[in-house]
Amino acid sequence: MTEQMKKYYEKRGQILVKNLKSRHFDAFYCPDAASALKKALELIPEGASVGWGGALSAQQIGLIDAVKTGNYAAIDRDSAKTAEERNQLLKRCLTADVFLSGANALSLDGEMVNIDGTGNRVAAIVYGPETVLVIAGMNKVCDTLDDAVTRARTVAAPMNKQRFPFKTPCEVTGSCADCKSEDCICNQILITRNCRPAGRIKFVLVGEELGF
């Protein structure tokens, strides 16, 4: 990454931190993955039960591995041997002490957009876990909420779809077709614009490109 890009991300990150705090979120800006991992671990109490959705950004900074190997009660859905066991682990995440998530997009004004297929991730963001910890690269930040919704639908979702064997138009074309496919992964669109209780949702913004 160029020095110009680093400075650009830092300046926008500082603006976003301020705007997130005005909406009662906790927010921190970290210039790189290593400092983001350090900050994230400071925000997770030892011994806490920790679950996560499809948190690719958290995985990329090493947070998922740190939780699995550290002094935490990891709720790892990928450890399930059956579909029923996996479903039970998803439900347990809804009462975890800490839930790790990414963000499909953020507006510079401090609103978060997420799109889900099953809905387990957006459910946990809305209610349940004591703390929601969002790891987001600065590539997710858009100028406006409309831009953020567009990014989530036309960039994040089609890219995320490539991880799954479902049959949707975006698997073939790479572009959103606003489909109603049975396999659609865009069934819930959540806009999180404020935090109550204050500080329940915490953001670690990373001055790198992470996730989709």
Predicted regions: what they are:
Residues 1, 21-24, 71-74, 85-87, ...:
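N-terminal start-of-chain detector that recognizes signal peptides
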Residues 2-8, 33, 115-117:
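Short, functional N-terminal and low-complexity linear motifs
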Residues 3, 10, 26, 42, ...:
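Glutamate identity and glutamate-enriched acidic tracts
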Residues 9-90, 94-99:
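N-terminal active-site beta-alpha-beta segment that forms phosphate/nucleotide-binding
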